[in-house]
């Protein structure tokens, strides 16, 4: 699998929404861009800039792909051109403490969250934030957005998630969940946005049903031996998780099933994972000074074929045997890719 060797530790990864370009932010305050081949994943450096001398922690790209936003340890917020890295705007001291997460909600709204739990909303056309929220008392770890209800959901190290109605002019959230008694580190929508999955510091995946509200989760999926720092949806029913133990696992949700390991950063914790515009390349960054691109296209093909096979149940023992061998395909592949760490199932 293609790896991009870096000179310093990366903290975030992002893909261009329209072109084969991947970005990463580094410990040194740099933001780097590479073009890659859609088929092979082979990369070539496009540009590298250093907007800040302090750690560049978080990246997010506007939906049109023209600009990428960066926040970090300095508390400042930067807008850069995705074409050449040139700075289009700097908001000095946008937060009073380090920015931990940046999220482009839509073309007219960007959310940022800092180490103290403060959330700010920004209009790209204005210099100052348009609203500030302070319902959390520990760092903001992740954001996701549900467009049907115009709801921005934030997770925090304080054990709560909160929901913000972006249409409201009030600086108070729509709701704050009950204390989950664990750090909430990552979130992603599943099932076409009907539900959400949240990763925690103790290695638990919690399932949240939007129809039942955001007060508490409705189900829990144990099994990860370490914290779940990053999540991405591969299909409406299948997610990939990046964990503190360096492994990227694939999990089916409802019904719950651990499918295997698709990549590993050895013993280094996975900081972030992202999926590219074609759902082929999974980008991941860790403390190993490497941006890894993993081809996950076959997983989608297997999922589609499995769905068809479930609809047409096998009539013979021979057909059942073939299906069983096919289901074991990703498990075998996973063991091969993570042979230095042992199989995924042995770790649980």
From Swiss-Prot:
WD repeat ranges? 5-44, 51-90, 94-132, 135-174, 179-218, 223-261, 264-304
SUPFAM superfamilies (alphabetical): WD40 repeat-like
Q: Which UniProt keywords apply?
A: Nucleus, Repeat, WD repeat
Q: Where in the cell is it found?
A: Nucleus, Nucleolus
Q: Where is this region: Disordered?
A: 299-348
Residue spans of biased composition, Acidic residues class: 299-318
According to the UniProt entry, the coiled-coil residues are none
Q: Which SMART domains match?
A: WD40
Alphabetical list of InterPro entries matching this protein: WD40/YVTN_repeat-like_dom_sf, WD40_repeat_dom_sf, WD40_rpt, WDR55, WDR55_POC1
Q: What Gene3D superfamilies does the database record attribute to this sequence?
A: YVTN repeat-like/Quinoprotein amine dehydrogenase
Q: List the disulfide bonds.
A: none
Q: What's any one GO cellular component for it?
A: nucleolus
Instruction: Name any one Pfam family assigned in the record.
Output: WDR55
Tell me which PANTHER family the record gives: WD REPEAT-CONTAINING PROTEIN 55
Family listed: Belongs to the WD repeat WDR55 family.
Name this polypeptide is given: WD repeat-containing protein JIP5
């Amino acid at each position: 699998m293609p790896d991009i060797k870096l000179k310093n530790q990366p903290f975030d990864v992002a893909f261009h929404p329209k072109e084969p370009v991947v970005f990463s932010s580094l410990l040194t305050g740099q933001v780097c861009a590479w073009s890659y081949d859609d088929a092979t994943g082979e990369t070539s450096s496009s540009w590298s800039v250093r907007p800040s001398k302090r750690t560049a922690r978080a990246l997010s790209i506007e939906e049109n792909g023209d600009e990428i936003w960066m926040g970090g340890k300095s508390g400042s917020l930067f807008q850069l051109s995705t074409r050449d890295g040139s700075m289009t705007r700097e908001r000095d001291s946008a937060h009073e403490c380090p920015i931990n997460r940046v999220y482009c909600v839509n073309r007219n709204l960007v959310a940022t969250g800092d180490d103290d739990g403060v959330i700010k909303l920004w209009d790209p056309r204005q210099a100052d934030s348009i609203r500030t929220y302070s319902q959390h008392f520990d760092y903001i770890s992740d954001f996701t957005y549900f467009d049907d209800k115009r709801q921005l959901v934030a997770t925090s190290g304080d054990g709560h998630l909160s929901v913000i109605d972006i249409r409201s002019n009030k600086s108070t959230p729509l709701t704050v969940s009950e204390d989950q008694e664990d750090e909430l580190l990552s979130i992603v929508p599943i099932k076409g946005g009907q539900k959400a999955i949240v990763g925690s510091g103790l290695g638990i995946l919690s399932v949240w049903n939007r129809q039942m509200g955001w007060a508490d989760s409705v189900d829990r999926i144990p099994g990860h031996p370490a914290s779940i720092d990053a999540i991405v949806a591969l299909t409406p029913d299948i997610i990939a998780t990046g964990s503190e133990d360096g492994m990227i696992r694939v999990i089916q949700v409802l019904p719950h099933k651990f499918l295997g390991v698709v990549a590993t950063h050895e013993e280094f914790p996975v900081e972030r994972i992202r999926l590219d515009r074609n759902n082929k390349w999974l980008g991941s960054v860790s403390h190993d000074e490497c941006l890894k691109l993993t081809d996950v296209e076959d997983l989608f093909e297997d999922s589609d074929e499995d769905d068809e096979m479930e609809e047409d149940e096998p009539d013979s023992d021979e057909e059942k045997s073939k299906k069983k061998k096919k289901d074991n395909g990703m498990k075998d592949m996973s063991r091969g890719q993570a042979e230095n760490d042992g199989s995924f199932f042995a770790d649980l």
